């Protein structure tokens, strides 16, 4: 072996025997508390008015569908059904419904509610797919998960200042 090859091999063995340097904890950056905005409850930026009728609640009788059959949920549920987890549905709100027993109010940026009103129906449908209670016809992916309802938009409400005069 040539001298340079022996030096390279020795250096490689030395490097491998020492190993990588340990990770170091990095302290979070300092926060200037004076620069933070004051805490406030969720609310729209101004007064709002309802401009359309709310959609009705979901039908009492759900027809069997194959929408989620490819997920094969019964094989996953022994591992987890979402218990102890919380999912925020930030949408058009989530209406209280018997198939959403773990619904929690989270806030309303559209009107003066708590997020558990849904005039558009979209947020409620999304929450049902995530955590709808199982029936013989349908179940959400994680039926034991908590759902926090946050209404951030609605086609049925407008800021009063945005309404054109009649």
Ranges and model annotations:
Residues 11-85, 98-99:
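Protease zymogen maturation seam
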Residues 1, 165-166:
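Short intrinsically disordered, low-complexity coil segments enriched in acidic
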Residues 1-8:
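Bacterial N-terminal signal peptides that target proteins for export
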Residues 111:
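N-terminal substrate-binding region of glycoside hydrolase catalytic domains
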Residues 75-87, 92-105, 114-164:
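Subtilisin-like serine protease catalytic core
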